Amino acid sequence: MDGSGVSVEPVPSARPGVARRTATGAVLLALVVSAFEGTVVTSAMPTITRELGGQHLYSWVFSAFLFASTVGVLISGKLADRLGRKPVFFAGMGLFLVGSALCGLADSVHALIAFRVLQGLGAGALQPTTLTISADLYTLRERAAVQGLFTGAWGAGNAVGPLIGGWLVMHASWRWVFLVNVPVGLFAALLLYLSYRDPPRRTDVKLDRWGPLLAGTSAAMLLFSLEPGHAELRWLCLLGAVVLGAGLVFQQRKSHAPLLPMELVKDRAVLSGVAGGIAGGALLYSMAAWVPLWMTEQGGQTPIVAGLTLLPMLLGWSVGSTFGVKLLVRGGMRLSAGVGFAVAATGAGLLALTAAYGWGTYAALASLAVLGMGLGPAASTSLIGPQSRAPWHHRGIVTSSLYATRLLGGSLTVAALALARGHFALQFAIAGALAGVVALGLAVAAPGKATSEA
């Protein structure tokens, strides 16, 4: 046991050999397929909206998934401790696969959006649960060596999504963008069922029933307030979001099991991580949603080429992330995340100019590479920085909370930019301005020196 009362010895599920390797493969597959679904739809959406109609609801296919994933992340972490990893994993996988199958059978864009909510809830439950299972499978010393596998799996799922989505649209049907998840997910679930043994359940874990409900409802009202339509209804939704948000703050101060402990809310690193998570998600998912549409509508590109357009950003993310930790150690979040978001803002600004003046595909690819080079260190150290400051027994909840802010930032920004649909230069400029504001804020408020592992 460490000083926080958390065991750092291997639990019964962390046995070496074939079973552990099989369980590792299962959670890696689950992580890939849930990350894959976040970007695979990007190259398929122009085709989907042409076939099903409802182009004015284009952004909701993304926002519904990301918002539901946020809710899934918020409720799954403690449930995995209370009920066991397997029940939460299988429930999440079940929702994800049922949602995927129904999305593949959808006959209207409204049905597709509803089924994307199911998908998102499942994906949101899967991603933190897979990371929790990986902590069960490996001792503390071993985890450092295998962490790259899980980071790489998430990155690979996001990177290949647009390419595979474009290929499926051109050579099969857009419906296979969703249906392809079913056999892969079933195989991952079978592998985990056969190879993984749950550690003892923790009956001492307290659940916050009202926190996720208030947070989810408030965010949903804010999302609805961004939908074009009746001004009175939008203002009513915005008012509801503010009231429910205030209720959430009051409830969390009184809760015995808050979503994020109050002592962490006051930590500058955590607050900086929240800002970085929201901005990182906003940039990543708004580009994933709107760049392929721009490429198909104004660039005349095929779905495969439109999907490939995102590859420089994702590769830039991977390259930039390798420098992020070095910057974090040298100058803290103020340097790593602040400089990262400044570079990302530059890339988004160049992309806006490319869209405005028609500089061509190569200029767009270069702009997205610059954006990714900045976004990689900014987003990764916005998570690693707060993790390094948090006590060991709070790191799980810090990780899931910051991951939820990334999804929430993505869902709200994709929906907000839909108000400027068709004005791609303006959309990219707004995203760049957001990154620039966050860069300035982090340069002033973020911790200015490296933190040591707790």
How would you describe each model-predicted region?
Residues 20-43, 56-64, 74, 94, ...:
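12-transmembrane solute porter fold
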Residues 31-34, 62-65, 69, 96, ...:
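Structural signature of transmembrane alpha-helices in multi-pass secondary transporters
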Residues 95-102, 184-191, 218, 243-247, ...:
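Transmembrane-helix signature of multi-pass solute transporters
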